[in-house]
Amino acid sequence: MSAVDPIADMFSAIKNAIMRRDDFLYVPSSKLKERILDVLKKEGFIQDWEALKGEKYEEEYKKMKELAEKSPNPKMKRYLKQLEEYNKGTQYPIKIYLKYLDPKKRKSAITNIVKVSKGGRRVYAGVRTMPYVKRGLGIAIVSTDAGVMTDHEARRMRKGGEVIAFVW
């Protein structure tokens, strides 16, 4: 993964995991990613997420290593490789539990995630110009001076900010 746009990398990893119908995935950590995941969890797009620091990382690594050795499934080896790769320096892995609306068909709660504000073109919106996503059925994730929130919360609090992504 590139370090040019870590948020876009996280969104791509989530979309790829949904297409593979995985139950969870690992991404490298950052404070902004954690705030975005809080919003996604609160809005019901993901089940949960957890930061794997210290003992939690050791337990998860041990469990994945055992599963990778026992299972012929290549997914387990991929998960183990991601865990090792993302636990470097001050970073730690984040485990994201995906949410599926229909367990049999594996229909995801996330239809699509689109990164709006990018490195070369930042997109800002005021209270009056805050975008509606899919006529109110989706959300816009907005970074304001009061923190990362949805477009609905930003309108309610009368805050503008950088539009990070659209999710529906």
Swiss-Prot record:
GO terms for molecular function: rRNA binding; structural constituent of ribosome. Signal peptide: none annotated. It comes from the Bacteria. One of its GO terms (biological process) is translation. Residues 59-93 are annotated as: Not found in other S8 sequences. Gene3D superfamilies: 3.30.1370.30, 3.30.1490.10. Keywords: Ribonucleoprotein, Ribosomal protein, RNA-binding, rRNA-binding. GO terms for cellular component: cytosolic small ribosomal subunit. The keyword RNA-binding applies. Pfam families: Ribosomal_S8 (PF00410). One of the primary rRNA binding proteins, it binds directly to 16S rRNA central domain where it helps coordinate assembly of the platform of the 30S subunit. HAMAP family: Ribosomal_uS8_B (MF_01302_B). Part of the 30S ribosomal subunit. Contacts proteins S5 and S12. Belongs to the universal ribosomal protein uS8 family. This is Small ribosomal subunit protein uS8. It comes from Aquifex aeolicus (strain VF5). The gene is rpsH.
